Structure formats: C-alpha cells, structure tokens
Amino acid sequence: LLLPAYFSKHDITDRQSIWVKKPTLGREGANVSYYEKRNGLEFAAKGSEHSAFYDQAGYIYQQKFELPNFDGMYPMIGSWVVGDVACGIGLREDFTPVTGNDSHFIPHYFVE
C-alpha cells in the first residue's frame, strides 16, 4: 500500500484525513506526531519520544493508515532494498501504533 506523502503540510489537499508527521531521518518512532489539516492541529503520537537530533533533517507528512490490532499488538513490516534488489524485511510490533525502541523485532534476510 502506497500512501500519499508530502514534504510540506501546505501541499496537502485532503483536508479530512489525519496525517502522520515523521522526520526524514528518524529512528524507531522518535518525533512522530499527527496533523489535522482541517483545523491545523498537531499532536504527539502515542508511543513516540522526542529527540532534538531528529528535528534537523526536516519532516514528511504521510496520510495516516490504521494498523490492525492483534491481541493488543500493532504489527508493521519494514523492507530493506539496496538499489533495485530486495534484501530483507523486518517484522516489528508494539503496544502502540508507533513502534518504539523496545518493540518486538524479527529480522529476515533474503538469500539467493
């Protein structure tokens, strides 16, 4: 699933959706917040911690997608791609939709 994303909140045309503001350089849920275009409100995402280091590279706004909840856990799949080659995936889950530093993580790598 590819979600709409913008480098500036001023480029967002969908005023009804909630947007996730994330640092372009970030780590494990740091500095993640939610943004509502219709009223200009921005609020911290549950599970996110703030680090001044990740404020430096700028932010991206991505349309929020509700993750499924399985027995109180929110799973997420991340991928590693080098050039145009898929190299692995990581399965991560946490008690909040924003995965943090202590979330469960299982890496997988691809071998030919």
Segments the model singles out, each with a brief description of its role:
Residues 28-30, 39-43, 53-59, 65-112:
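ATP-dependent carboxylate activation and anion-phosphoryl transfer catalytic cores
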